[in-house]
Amino acid sequence: MSNVDAQHTEELGVETELEGTVVVPAVPTDSVAPLFTNPADWFVPPFPEKLEGLDVSAGFLADLALKTVPLDAECSTASIAHRMRLGMLITEALLQRLTHEKLIEIKGMVGLHNHRYAMLDHGWDALRRLMSFCSYAGPAPVSLKSYTEMITQQVRNRPPASRQALDQAMSNLILSDYAKEILGLVVGSGRSLFLTGPSGNGKTATARALVDALPGEIWIPYAIEVDGQVIRMFDTHSHLPVPHTNDDYDRRWVRIRPPLVVVGGELTLASLDLAYTETQRFYEAPLQVKSNGGVLLVDDLGRQRCSATELLNRWIVPLEYRIDYLTLSTGKKIQMPFEQIVVFATNLTEADLEDEAFMRRMGYRLHAEAPSAETYTEIFLRYARSRGIFADENLVMQLLRKYQTEGRIPKACDPRDLIDRAIDRCRLLRQPIKLTEQGLEVVWKGYFGLPHTDPKR
């Protein structure tokens, strides 16, 4: 394949349905990079031995140390080193600098390179000035350059997902081999996915399973520094730390599982930029930055507070060039890496969006159809087993006939919802947990309401 043909194939992407045929684009052999089993094992951030070896200025770190001193009643070199995630020698050098500037004083010795410190009056004055500019006090940040290099190397040297890993990640879903192959291509390539289909047929669950198929872990910093400003990166809601057996690494970084960030109707254009408040006086990374190295799921596209067209236009440059531009409160724009799998899940059609430029940039497209009778039965029986309940296939057949009688289209989520409600009823009536025709009839009415064919509707 020529480079021109390869580029054309990449732009068009691949479109398929869950029950359809997969067309796999060829990849030029010269585009394959060396891959590692677990990039986090190869790109361990080295432990900094000296202050001069850090990628952030000593002056900035000294200011951060001054903001950290008052946080502990018994402040010591060790306590500051722990809070700032720096080595003892570097931390002691920063504190000695503050001592020479008459901002803090030594109150005693705890051990080798470990002293007790206290604030002086000049230190409190300096602290107030610093807090009026930036109130961040926590792990020392890394530079934007270091973050960009680290996240890019890790993501682009990630190995392809194995079929076994993909099958395990999708084990709770019932998908065709074709759909699994497309999802494997999404995971292996890191390209975006446009996931369409009626609501309730597993689009969100499928997107969530993608992150479980991503191999290995990644390193991210707690924070980054740009022009003396701090952007907090680590988020306990989005990032799950994993143990690292080797203690000889830069503790300003944390090893995590590939993150999953989910956003739905609450998404606004403003939430895609740096969040800055006057009270904390530092920035919070936007959701697409927090999802770097993992999966960003834009769920229920078309129901956001901004229009779908505005939102899609915002993503065109990042999807095309793998970079994003964010704006500081000063008006300065900074360039951020855009290294994640973006999944757009929607019940809209491509015709509804009417954005050809955006659709060209979709790596892959997948359509989730309503389940067939066989698939519905398998979903029902499998979920019943997972809840420890026996399910008679005859009961499932009766449910399928009710769909036809009432003019309803089955959804993949219906078996779970009906079984859960049947369990609710058994518990309410203090009956043994089991599925019965009478019980399912009651919860059916409570779940669906009046049939579509009922004249009272």
Regions found by a protein language model. Give the residues of each.
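Short, amphipathic alpha-helical interaction segments positioned at domain boundaries
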Residues: E52, H113-R163, Y447-K456
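Dynamic helix-loop-helix/coil hinge segments at AAA+ ATPase domain boundaries and subdomain interfaces
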Residues: T152-K180, E406-I409
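A short helix-turn-beta junction within AAA+ P-loop NTPase domains corresponding to the substrate/partner-engaging
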Residues: R314, E354-A370
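Short acidic, hydrophobic short linear motifs in intrinsically disordered regions
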Residues: L71-R83
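Short amphipathic alpha-helical interaction segments
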Residues: M84-H100
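Conserved AAA+ ATPase small/helical "lid" subdomain
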Residues: T377-E441
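Conserved ASCE/P-loop NTPase catalytic core
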Residues: I174-V343
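A short, conserved structural fragment
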Residues: T99-G111
